[in-house]
Amino acid sequence: MPAEAKKPAPKAGRSRRKSRELVLKGIYLGLMNQKDTSVIIRELADDPDFDRADYEYFRQLLEGVAESIDELDARLAGLLDRQVSELSPIEHAILCIAAYELIHDVTIPYRVAINEGVELAKLYGGTDGHKYVNGVLDKIAAEARPDEFQRGRR
């Protein structure tokens, strides 16, 4: 962790949801301004929610999504009804975060990853954007975790 970034409060009370919200802000900054993750982490350390987030999860998710953005975009491209470049930057970031969790973090149940993406879209996305996000994430879950997805559909 860079020396300039402050560390959040002890683990009690820290939230993965707040971590995902911060990652959304970070990925958005990265997509819009081509900023490095270390710069993004330093900037987000001043966010009022930073102390309420699970720092380790935030850092891991931010770095994982940033490093995998090309892979995630390629995966999304085959499932969208438009070009990835035509997505709003917010919905693009949300889809990348949830897709990363679905593809790379099997410790998170697929329904949780989808629900968290939908909740971010409700908070930060456009009108009815959450419905679009839900549909795309459902397709990713079916591809990335077919057994878990089928069990969940029964």
Swiss-Prot record:
Coiled-coil ranges from the UniProt annotation: none
Keywords on record: RNA-binding, Transcription, Transcription antitermination, Transcription regulation
Top-level taxon: Bacteria
Pfam families: NusB
HAMAP family in alphabetical order: NusB
Gene3D superfamilies assigned to the protein according to its UniProt record, in alphabetical order: NusB-like
Assigned protein family: Belongs to the NusB family.
The protein's name: Transcription antitermination protein NusB
Gene: nusB
Phylogenetic lineage: Bacteria, Pseudomonadati, Pseudomonadota, Betaproteobacteria, Nitrosomonadales
GO terms assigned for molecular function: RNA binding
GO biological process: DNA-templated transcription termination; transcription antitermination
Biological function: Involved in transcription antitermination. Required for transcription of ribosomal RNA (rRNA) genes. Binds specifically to the boxA antiterminator sequence of the ribosomal RNA (rrn) operons.
CC per GO annotation: cytosol
Signal peptide start and end residues: none
